[in-house]
């Protein structure tokens, strides 16, 4: 793209601003945002988080309870941060969490094809109290809307 923009910092030094195409996402406050509203870069970033978590769980020497605890209280909340601004479909959420969920279930000595009713069911009905990220995304959007 022709031309460049510069910005002075508080010491007076000039810095050239990076120019991106409208479809390119740039990380802003931990979330990849593109000017045209596409979320391909953000989706890939979230998938990378899932793959990284799966790799760490797979090679760790943790117990089955610690693996499930880490998935529930560390990995899922790290995804929850961007839910109020993301607009992923249910299939996209499945592709994001699939590697992490599979590795966690394997480490917890459970079959990877365990029914979602058990995973996302409450402990009152012998479920694991995990939250479906697609449903959580909708709740986060509603909560943000109600705060506005």
What do the predicted segments below correspond to?
Residues 5-91, 108-111, 139-148:
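Basic, alpha-helical interaction scaffolds
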Residues 50, 93-105:
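Short amphipathic alpha-helical coiled-coil/interface segments
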Residues 83, 96, 100, 109-148:
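Extended C-terminal regions of large enzymes
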Residues 1:
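Conserved polymerase palm-domain catalytic core
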